[in-house]
Amino acid sequence: MQHYKPADFYLIGSDESGKGDSFGGICVSAVLIEKKQLINLENLQVTDSKKLSDHTVKLLAKSIQTTVMDHHTITLDPKQYNDLTKSLKNTNLLLTNLHCQLYQKLLEKNQLLRQTVTISIDQFANQELFVNYLNKLTNFTDKTVLLPDQFLINGETKSLVIAAASILARDSFINQLQLLNQKVNYDLPKGSSHGIEQALLFLNQQRGFSQIEQFKQVAKLNFKNVTKFLQQLVY
């Protein structure tokens, strides 16, 4: 059950998609609603995007975008993801940066007082770690307003506004993966286990991928299965 501050009128929820996928980059979404709009998300039967088919995600994403007060998504393609994780040296630091960028954008664009908003995040790091990551970032002036009020484990199942954000993020990631599939003329597998090595081998043998820079355009280089495969190649 999600608990709200007595003075809040607005809710922001955020989630990411692609974090556990070897192929593709990452997409982070945040949704802003007036608290009274929760019933609208209930009526749409918004739920955890991982329980939905790609087709249903696409349909729900369109409905959510026209229902909520505001929303925003940051999409990193594989190259951007790889460059940023290499420079930041920590995926969770990158995620903290992206989520906070979304909070800042929604708060400023809609001219909201922070005390009127409850921010909830699908927890990828507990509050203490999140604060540590936030303190390492230099691109925010007032960091206190960007700290979520609620860190919810499996937040998509506990908060409708996080679930809505998870659907928008998943929709963006699906679209990104479809574009990558078209680019290499191959259906790249989702997740990080089944079919990953076969897909990497196909790209190497059938699509002429022989350099790290080529794989960097489609896969996450910091994933162990990708790293292991690339170490076997002779450059």
Swiss-Prot record:
Domain RNase H type-2, first and last residues per copy: 9-235
UniProt remark on cofactor binding: Manganese or magnesium. Binds 1 divalent metal ion per monomer in the absence of substrate. May bind a second metal ion after substrate binding.
Location in or out of the cell: Cytoplasm
EC numbers, comma separated: 3.1.26.4
InterPro entries, per database record: RNase_HII/HIII, RNase_HII/HIII_dom, RNaseH-like_sf, RNaseH_sf
Function statement: Endonuclease that specifically degrades the RNA of RNA-DNA hybrids.
Catalyzed reactions: Endonucleolytic cleavage to 5'-phosphomonoester
Null mutant phenotype: Probably essential, it was not disrupted in a global transposon mutagenesis study.
Keywords annotated in UniProt: Cytoplasm, Endonuclease, Hydrolase, Metal-binding, Nuclease
Protein residues bound to a divalent metal cation: D15, E16, D122
Protein name: Ribonuclease HIII
GO cellular component, as recorded: cytoplasm; ribonuclease H2 complex
Cofactor(s) named in the record: a divalent metal cation
SUPFAM superfamilies per UniProt: Ribonuclease H-like (SSF53098)
Source organism per UniProt: Mycoplasma genitalium (strain ATCC 33530 / DSM 19775 / NCTC 10195 / G37) (Mycoplasmoides genitalium)
Annotated Pfam families: RNase_HII (PF01351)
